[in-house]
Swiss-Prot record:
<dbReference type="GO" id="GO:0016765">
    <property type="term" value="F:transferase activity, transferring alkyl or aryl (other than methyl) groups"/>
</dbReference>
<feature type="binding site">
    <location>
        <position position="268"/>
    </location>
    <ligand>
        <name>substrate</name>
    </ligand>
</feature>
<feature type="binding site">
    <location>
        <position position="94"/>
    </location>
    <ligand>
        <name>L-tryptophan</name>
    </ligand>
</feature>
<dbReference type="InterPro" id="IPR012148">
    <property type="entry name" value="DMATS-type_fun"/>
</dbReference>
<protein>
    <recommendedName>
        <fullName>Indole diterpene prenyltransferase nodD2</fullName>
        <ecNumber>2.5.1.-</ecNumber>
    </recommendedName>
</protein>
<comment type="similarity">
    <text>Belongs to the tryptophan dimethylallyltransferase family.</text>
</comment>
<dbReference type="InterPro" id="IPR017795">
    <property type="entry name" value="Aro_prenylTrfase_DMATS"/>
</dbReference>
<feature type="binding site">
    <location>
        <position position="270"/>
    </location>
    <ligand>
        <name>substrate</name>
    </ligand>
</feature>
<comment type="pathway">
    <text>Secondary metabolite biosynthesis.</text>
</comment>
<feature type="binding site">
    <location>
        <position position="351"/>
    </location>
    <ligand>
        <name>substrate</name>
    </ligand>
</feature>
<keyword id="KW-0808">Transferase</keyword>
<feature type="binding site">
    <location>
        <position position="353"/>
    </location>
    <ligand>
        <name>substrate</name>
    </ligand>
</feature>
<feature type="binding site">
    <location>
        <position position="418"/>
    </location>
    <ligand>
        <name>substrate</name>
    </ligand>
</feature>
<feature type="binding site">
    <location>
        <position position="194"/>
    </location>
    <ligand>
        <name>substrate</name>
    </ligand>
</feature>
<comment type="function">
    <text>Indole diterpene prenyltransferase; part of the gene cluster that mediates the biosynthesis of the indole diterpenes nodulisporic acids (NA). Nodulisporic acid A (NAA) and its chemically modified derivatives are of particular significance because of their highly potent insecticidal activity against blood-feeding arthropods and lack of observable adverse effects on mammals, in particular the tremogenicity associated with the paspaline-derived IDTs is not observed.</text>
</comment>
<feature type="binding site">
    <location>
        <position position="272"/>
    </location>
    <ligand>
        <name>substrate</name>
    </ligand>
</feature>
<dbReference type="Pfam" id="PF11991">
    <property type="entry name" value="Trp_DMAT"/>
</dbReference>
Amino acid sequence: MDSTGRQPLSQDGQPWQALASGLGFPDEDQKYWWSVMAPLLGELMKWANYPVDKQYLVLAFCHEYILPFCGPRPTAEGGIFWPTLITKDGTPFEPSLNFYKNKATLRVGYAPACELSGSNDDPINQRAPIAALEHQKRVLPQQNLKWVDNFKKAWFIDNDDAVALKARVHNELFEQAAVQCLIGYVFSDYTQVKVAMSPLWKSVQTGQQISRVIWDTFRQLGDDASSYLDCLSVLEEYTESKQAKLAQVQPSFVNFDVNLKGDYQQSRLKVYYATPCTAFDTMVQVFTLGGRLKGPEVDHAIECLRVLWPSVLAVPENHPDDQDLPRRYHSVAVTQFNFELWPGAKLPVPQIYLPTNFYGRDELEIAEGLEGFFKTLGWSEPFHAYKQNYIATCATPEGKWKAIQHDVSFSFKDSSPYVSVYYKPELSVLSSPS
């Protein structure tokens, strides 16, 4: 192993290179996406100390089941064919590393697309995500798409109606936010699959608020959603409260597991929220659902969040907790949260996404902040030497970044912080689009 604890591989023998040589590509689009995706994933897995056979397994899965649904490559000017707000510049995929106690885990999220996406044959890109999920069934026999079917029935829009709706809205930024379906993977002991679906288009079509569409949909699911109703009622109560109005926070989409070891009704569900506010007091208020989530573990989580917040965000010295951070203009500068709903649970479990892409310190300062935070927790695995690993993984010899730290998520699970760092690939650095 080298000084970061990584297993050495010769530059000519990287798993991603071997797979490219052995499997090839059906077209230049997939060849391009592999050139920007695979080396970064390979380096992240070495950072997380994945054994070589696991690296091959993950990369082979990505080659077969993600690559065909990345859509056309960018234009010569760098324009993304089907941009979404999964990243602020529209890059359609985003890897992340989760750090939890003595383990680091690779995850990948992406917005499936194809040549039909945005055309009159598929104006709001509903085909590619479903095709991607169907395609991967053969290696994920436990995949259950019942939740996908439920929300597809409720929120997908007939093609003719979608054409008319898109023409009526005619708002590029809205279209990038209103993603009908995203897919995420957790490459742990087995491949976990998460699907996110948004009711934004349905909200416009029906004229209802997004929150109303979400709550009504869950109620209409009957027995499928009955074991989640206690948690949902807490979220709905908070969403309609004066506290939520002051925080300008609203739900935006739902997320659920589809590759399950048990019945689909054992799935974890999530409801995502977003707010333009950045005052620390507001973050705590949303994180605790206005004080509805409380107790020693919540108190401990807030203590840890207070340490992490200025470690990665550009918080001015002596900045008051009740004031927003100095504004850095971007049309979608928000802080996101999600709330996990487990069947039979009485209360949701909160998670916050610290918006380093909008309000972060510079890249090395973020890396130093994360390493310092890990040290306060007593985490000391080789992959917790964060700054050194980040430089080794994402810096070029010329001092450019192959990927930037786009978001840092934080939650608390089993009395321990649960931290994920999301890396936005810098396509212009990783590979020329033409």
